[in-house]
């Protein structure tokens, strides 16, 4: 990327940070401390007054009440030798009820939890984000019935699975801008989001970013029967009994885990079929053989360009997803969607002019091998030429 283009990119980052309030924290300040055990939240009079004030702000207020007001439990664990990171385990679902309030009006009420009928279940999600911000943990929401929390005019947007992203996702507009860039550059699905205030068991928890989750679905990642969604995951070690397999190319502390088929439903035959396909692709990649029959190279180029535009400094690749739409020999491995932007746009100190994936000692995605191939470089250049003049105009309307 030439110096002029680099300066354009940096100016774009500065502009986004300025309009987002210079990176100031937008989260609530009066957050309770959390434990790794189940506790009961007891709202105070001050909490009740603050909830009334939150109802008047105009943003949707998500009031979640768990059965018996039990906090969703979790335990923090440290990576074993040879692995990396912090994450949470024992993060089991708690039955709950959700009431959505906007402008002092109740616009939605799930009712109490009844399996497949009403309510939802809530659990703590995430890795570092779940550990580093006590009182403002991220959550996964699993509804008994499909719902579109973003109120769009297509029933296909309805889904049971949603997430509430905490700080740093909720502190500025970087995640919103990054998803807009992902949609524009990749010409494919990226999660839709919106800011919401969250009250859990009567206690205000601050500002969150409501987001669609990465999963199979007609309006998400439509892989269908016979297809798969994989994540190359540095946190595989937190669930060693789950199905997984290593890569021949990626850093050894990462392994492929399954997003679809679900780890509870996947068969040994499916695991073998999927891993064999990946290994055939990796062998061809490592030995300089043609890879076009295995991979949609344009999607890999777009994935890398997204992170170069964002200046991603995440050494683990910011959640690397792959998908294949069916079991037919004609369908190809695709890279994406992009996810996790806590290391983007200057949030992590980084002096490189590219994303961290260009570093020669860091194999993020398959970039180290792909950059040796003319066909990949051609696709990367084509993608840049297609998008370079429309990035700002595309992103601004979504902020």
What are these regions (language model features)?
Residues 53-57, 89-92, 113-116, 131-135, ...:
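Extracellular/periplasmic catalytic domains that process cell-envelope and extracellular macromolecules
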Residues 29-117:
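Regulatory N- and C-terminal appendages and interdomain linkers associated
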Residues 35, 49-53, 58-60, 70-74, ...:
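Middle-to-C-terminal accessory/interaction subdomains
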Residues 95-107, 173-187:
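Zn2+-dependent metallopeptidase catalytic core
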Residues 138-142, 161-166, 180, 197-199, ...:
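Structural recognition of the beta-strand scaffold that forms the well-ordered cores
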Residues 142-148, 156-169, 187-191, 203-305, ...:
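Internal "kinase-insert"/substrate-recognition segments embedded within catalytic cores
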Residues 1-30:
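Bacterial Sec-dependent N-terminal signal peptides
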Residues 99-100, 105, 111-168, 267:
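Conserved oxyanion/phosphate-binding beta-strand-loop segments in alpha/beta enzyme cores
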């Amino acid at each position: 990327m030439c110096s002029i283009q680099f300066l354009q990119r940096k100016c774009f980052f500065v502009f986004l940070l300025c309009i987002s309030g210079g990176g100031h924290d937008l989260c609530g300040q009066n957050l309770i401390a959390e434990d790794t055990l189940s506790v009961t939240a007891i709202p105070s009079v001050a909490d009740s007054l603050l909830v009334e004030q939150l109802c008047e702000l105009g943003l949707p207020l998500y009031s979640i009440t768990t059965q018996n007001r039990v906090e969703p439990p979790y335990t923090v664990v440290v990576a074993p030798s040879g692995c990396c990171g912090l994450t949470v385990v024992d993060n089991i679902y708690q039955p709950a009820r959700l009431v959505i309030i906007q402008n002092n009006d109740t616009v939605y009420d799930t009712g109490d939890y009844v399996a497949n009928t009403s309510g939802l279940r809530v659990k703590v999600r995430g890795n570092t984000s779940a550990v580093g911000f006590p009182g403002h943990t991220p959550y996964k929401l699993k509804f008994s019935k499909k719902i579109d929390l973003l109120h769009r005019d297509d029933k296909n947007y309805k889904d049971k699975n949603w997430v509430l992203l905490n700080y740093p996702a909720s502190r500025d507009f970087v995640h919103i801008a990054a998803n807009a860039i992902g949609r524009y550059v990749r010409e494919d699905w990226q999660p839709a989001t919106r800011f919401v205030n969250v009250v859990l068991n009567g206690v205000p928890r601050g500002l969150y970013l409501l987001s669609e989750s990465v999963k199979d679905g007609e309006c998400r990642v439509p892989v269908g029967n016979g297809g798969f969604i994989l994540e190359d995951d540095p946190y595989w070690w937190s669930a060693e009994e789950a199905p997984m397999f290593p890569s021949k190319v990626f850093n050894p502390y990462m392994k492929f885990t399954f997003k679809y088929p679900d780890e509870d439903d996947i068969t040994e035959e499916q695991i073998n079929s999927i891993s064999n396909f990946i290994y055939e692709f990796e062998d061809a990649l490592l030995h300089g053989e043609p890879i076009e029959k295995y991979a949609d190279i344009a999607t890999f180029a777009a994935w890398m360009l997204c992170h170069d535009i964002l200046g991603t400094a995440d050494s683990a690749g910011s959640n690397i997803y792959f998908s294949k739409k069916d079991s037919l020999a004609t369908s190809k491995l695709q890279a994406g969607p992009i996810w996790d932007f806590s290391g983007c746009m200057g949030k992590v100190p980084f002096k490189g002019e590219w994303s961290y994936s260009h570093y020669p000692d860091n194999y993020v995605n398959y970039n180290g091998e792909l950059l040796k191939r003319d066909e990949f470089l051609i696709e990367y250049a084509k993608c840049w030429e297609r998008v370079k003049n429309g990035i700002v105009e595309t992103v601004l309307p979504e902020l």
